[in-house]
Swiss-Prot record:
Keywords: 4Fe-4S, Cytoplasm, Iron, Iron-sulfur, Metal-binding, S-adenosyl-L-methionine, Transferase. SUPFAM superfamilies: Radical SAM enzymes (SSF102114). This is Ribosomal protein uS12 methylthiotransferase RimO. GO terms for cellular component: cytosol. Its cofactor is [4Fe-4S] cluster. Residues 381-447 form the TRAM domain. [4Fe-4S] cluster 2 binds at C162, C166, C169. The gene is rimO. Pfam families: Radical_SAM, TRAM_2, UPF0004.
Length: 450
């Protein structure tokens, strides 16, 4: 049994997996623990290790289990005295994790983020904790956060949960119903993030476009962005996870005229075959998706559109898949990611007939990615010679690197910069594009921006 020790003598490390929304949870947990007196470290030679897990699809679950098993080595042979699994995998399989991984000292569900200090203290006394209740956590106040990733970019989680009932998805089970955070709290949190050095605020949720629809004082994503754009120090505001049916004329008009709102929309479309979209439980069909993309491009000059697509959904035929490939070639999205359908227990799709064989899913995944790679390469090559504004993030060898308005952190490419003088990370420069691949650009710095 573990013996208790003083909080101020304890070092805590976090391994965070999955999406940026999960990353925010990890930053909040570390912030609460730091405020309580624990020392935060990036090294796994720590007294306490939290593994913040993902359980969206099978690959994510496997990665999370492997991460727990890897850190369990420190539980047996290193300094670690407490090992906890947090996040979506802990929410979904708490008893299985405790049964199958004896090195675990506890599991902490998605609804217990705000109680992490008490849970860690109990685990430090030797109690094997199982804290998994309804996924009801919501940041109703500005909570402390320990930043991860680039110091110049911060994620702002504007809501929790999801009310969309896509038939393949377990997120509503793991995160609960859709719950918007109060706009006043979000503005205060964004102000604090900017004061800490964030030049870019990235808004995330399971569905950002639904924001405010559940609040007593009805508000909207457009209203929230307008308030955030007035904050001092915020240069870019970026929107991810925009549900196609939730994109309003007001939001489009704001993006067209507000210079701080990146001309960038991440719109998960999932497929282009009406037959597959209906089977998925999606509400917007292919004709309307095409119409939306054409409208957005005409209304917002210079807009970058990113999307995500699933291949191998139950019943997807070769004709359905060819329709998706045709959509990619015709609509020429700037960015697109692809993943293979994962048969998740407890979802309606898992019980559907005509499950697509794994080898077919893999082959379709490769074909779709190859088509999009050539689309992206051609679009990037067409930008050679044009000018772009870049947020400088760091240096690699002789080159600096950063991102343009068209590049979201972690998921899109980079702009590699050649400069006649030293550049300061966290600043913006104007550059001319000199070369392009399917993902990254090369550019020559023309001037530094204020």
């Amino acid at each position: 049994m573990n013996s208790p020790w003083k909080a101020e003598a304890s070092r805590i490390a976090l391994v965070s997996l999955g999406c940026d929304k999960n990353r925010v949870d990890g930053e909040v947990m570390l912030g609460l623990l730091e405020r309580a007196g624990y020392q935060i470290t990036a090294e796994l030679e720590a007294d306490i290790i939290l593994v913040n897990t993902c359980a969206f699809i099978q690959d994510a679950k496997q990665e999370s289990i492997e991460a727990i098993l890897e850190t369990a080595r420190y539980r047996g042979n290193g300094r670690c005295r407490v090992l906890l699994a947090t996040g979506c995998l802990a929410q979904r399989y708490p008893d299985e994790l405790l049964r199958d991984i004896p090195e675990l000292d506890g599991v902490v569900g998605t609804g217990e983020v705000g109680r992490v200090v008490d849970i860690v203290r109990r685990a430090a006394t030797g109690e094997r904790v199982r804290e998994v209740g309804p996924p009801g956590f919501l940041g109703r106040e500005v909570l402390p956060r320990v930043p991860s990733g680039s110091p110049f970019t911060a994620y702002l989680k504007i809501s929790e949960g999801c009310d969309n009932r896509c038939l393949y998805c377990v997120i509503p089970q793991l995160r609960g119903p859709y719950r918007s955070r109060e706009a006043s709290v979000l503005v205060r949190e964004a102000r604090a993030l900017a004061a800490r050095g964030a030049r870019e605020i990235v808004l995330v949720a399971q569905d950002t476009t639904r924001y405010g629809s559940d609040l007593k004082e009805r508000t909207s994503l457009t209203d929230l962005v307008s308030r955030l754009a007035a904050l001092e120090g915020v240069a870019w505001i970026r929107l991810l996870y925009c549900y196609p049916s939730g994109i309003t004329f007001e939001l489009v008009e704001l993006m067209a005229r507000e210079p701080r709102l990146c001309r960038y929309l991440d719109i998960p479309l999932q497929h282009a075959s009406d037959r597959v979209l209906r089977r998925m439980g999606r509400s917007t069909m292919s004709y309307d998706l095409r119409k939306l993309i054409l409208f957005l491009r005409s209304a917002i000059p210079g807009l970058t559109i990113r999307s995500t697509f699933m291949v191998g959904f139950p019943g997807e035929t070769e004709a359905d898949f060819e329709e998706l490939l045709g959509f990619l070639k015709a609509m020429k999205l700037d960015r697109a990611g692809f993943f293979a359908y994962s048969r998740e227990e407890g979802t309606p799709a898992a019980r559907m007939p005509d499950q697509v064989p794994p080898e077919v899913k893999r082959e379709r995944l490769e074909r779709a990615a190859a088509v999009q790679r050539e689309v992206s390469r051609a679009l990037n090559r067409a930008r050679v010679g044009s000018e772009v504004t870049v947020l400088v993030e760091g240096r690699k060898g002789e080159q600096y690197y950063g991102r343009s308005e068209a590049d979201a952190p972690d998921i899109d490419g980079r702009v590699f910069l050649s400069a006649a003088s030293d550049l300061e990370p966290g600043t913006f420069v104007r550059a001319r594009i000199t070369g392009a691949g399917p993902y990254d650009l090369r550019a020559r710095v023309l001037s530094t921006l204020p």
